[in-house]
Amino acid sequence: MKPQDLKLPYFWEDRCPKIENHVFYVPSYYPKYEEFVMPSWQNLFANEGPVCCELCSGNGDWVVEQALKDTSINWIAVEKRFDRVRKIWSKMSNHKVNNLLIVCGEAQTFFTHYVTDASFQKIVVNFPDPWPKFRHRKHRLFQDVFVQDMVRVLVEGGQLTLVTDDHTYLTNSIQVMLNYLSPGMQDPYYVNVKDNYGGSWFENLWRSKGEKIFCTEFVKRVGI
């Protein structure tokens, strides 16, 4: 299957939440999110295995590799750009991956309206846009409200991982996560990832430019 074989299932004026071809479409600026009844993960994946979630999935190289590596774990790939969703879907289809659901939409909207408490064993955020300019800071993913939402959907003992090439974004995000989660690494709470992290297109891009790759991990405290 080619990326262009996946067609958007509605025109903008007819947009609505919809699951089709292993893609969950979560449109922007939609006033009736709550009218869509989200199936359980067990129904979506046809099993009761653990569910992990990748945010900022890009072209899908990393998450498809993870899904193929261990088919007992279910994965959700969240990517807001439809051109990238198409590429993830193409890889998923060609590799016959059955333990992956793609979410086409904003992570915040998906979590707020469709992810119940204690849903995920792990959340991995790979190379999010750092929005480095101060006037764009409201767009940054690692802000208090959304970090609290990520904590909400993690199981007790669940893990939140951030991988980025932007050191300033890394340290700012760590300061936010320290308010709600326990660090999984010793101070300064991150490592420089020297080995191949898993075939991410963005990892390959930044390494080709000589950039360092940083990783931090946090764990949900019992009782949160």
UniProtKB/Swiss-Prot annotation:
PROSITE patterns: SAM_MT_TRMB (PS51625). It catalyses: guanosine(46) in tRNA + S-adenosyl-L-methionine = N(7)-methylguanosine(46) in tRNA + S-adenosyl-L-homocysteine. Belongs to the class I-like SAM-binding methyltransferase superfamily. TrmB family. This is tRNA (guanine-N(7)-)-methyltransferase. It comes from the Bacteria. S-adenosyl-L-methionine binds at E54, E79, E106, D129. Pathway: tRNA modification; N(7)-methylguanine-tRNA biosynthesis. The active site is at D129. The gene is trmB. Catalyzes the formation of N(7)-methylguanine at position 46 (m7G46) in tRNA. InterPro entries: SAM-dependent_MTases_sf, tRNA_(Gua-N-7)_MeTrfase_Trmb, tRNA_methyltr_TrmB_bact. HAMAP family: tRNA_methyltr_TrmB (MF_01057). Keywords: Methyltransferase, S-adenosyl-L-methionine, Transferase, tRNA processing. GO terms for molecular function: tRNA (guanine(46)-N7)-methyltransferase activity. Substrate binds at K133, D165. Its EC number is 2.1.1.33. Pfam families: Methyltransf_4. One of its GO terms (cellular component) is tRNA methyltransferase complex. The lineage of its organism: Bacteria, Pseudomonadati, Chlamydiota, Chlamydiia, Chlamydiales.
